[in-house]
Amino acid sequence: MTNLEVDYAIIGAGPTGLYGAYYAGFRGWSTAVIDALPEVGGQITAMYPEKDIFDVAGFPAVRGRVLVEQLKEQADQFSPNYVLGEQASELTAPEGGPVTLTTAQGSTITAKALLITGGIGSFRPRPLPAGSDWEDKGLAFFVPKPDHYANKEVVIVGGGDSALDWAHMLHPIAKRISIVHRRDQFRAHAAMVTQAREMGIDLLTPYEVTALRGEEHLAEVEITSKTDGAVTLLPAQEVIAALGFIANIGPIADWGLDLDKRHIRVNTSMQTNLPGVFAAGDIAVYEGKVPLISIAFGEAALAVNNAAPIINPELGVFPGHSSGESN
């Protein structure tokens, strides 16, 4: 159980939260970063540590875990207080402050301002209906260790970015990669689909996985055509279900924030309807929002700098350039 008083508190230790911690530290503020997960990195650490990310400025490609390591190193210059493995459960944000957070584990964090970077909230993968008895016997929902798939026949189920990203990542080491999608059109970026075809990855559409078969471990996947009902058997030792996630923002829904479904509405300063409370990253929504990690970094900087007059009325929003002095 932890009791902290800081200038700036951040919910979420994913990339957006870590960059927010860096920027708050750059402005000379004490910070606390709270996350329900036991490690920093958010969804990237939990689900995609070996996935390459292509839309971070300055990096043609960067492995997820490497990006998280560098963001943490950047933030740690200013010694943020990490409160990990604890879920923020209650918030009070009176006019004039301070903001007080209480975690489900009994910790209390008091801050002059708060940034919520909770991503999509808590999440669990959408199940593969035909695979309910096959977890740990060949069915997986994430790819934390690509080498596990070396020299194996792999079926990836889904048509989004994750399905194509994993196919591209595993293609050099797997014996064979097949993607099964229940629609003719993929949701993934068209260039990734084209590249998959050119690489020789089998794209099987419109098909649905109707059964997994094997003895102690998966041996084959039954797929059924949605066009004519024809059944095909694919030899496979591994199946990766990339069907998206069921998300829940949890206690945040009860804090009196102006919500749009699972997202928090913010203004152009990234401020919410509650005094001293800001939001950035996937959880924040505004007109024209584009949910990209590169944009989330800018949102975090906006949120931090617009909190400056709350932290100290003598401070301006603009911090000065990073090549000069902070504050």
Which residues are covered by each model-predicted region?
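Glycine-rich FAD pyrophosphate-binding loop
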Residues: 11, 25-47, 176-188
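Conserved N-terminal glycine-rich FAD pyrophosphate-binding loop of Rossmann-like flavoproteins
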Residues: 38-62, 189-197
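A Rossmann-like FAD-binding core segment of flavoenzymes
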Residues: 72-103, 108-111, 171-268, 311, ...
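Residue-level detector of alpha-helix initiation sites
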Residues: 14-16, 39, 122, 161-162, ...
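Rossmann-like NAD(P)H-binding beta-loop-alpha module
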Residues: 38, 150-173
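N-terminal Rossmann-like FAD-binding beta1-loop-alpha1 element of flavoenzymes
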Residues: 6-33, 166-171
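FAD-site-proximal beta/loop scaffold in flavoenzymes
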Residues: 127, 132-150, 235-294, 302-309
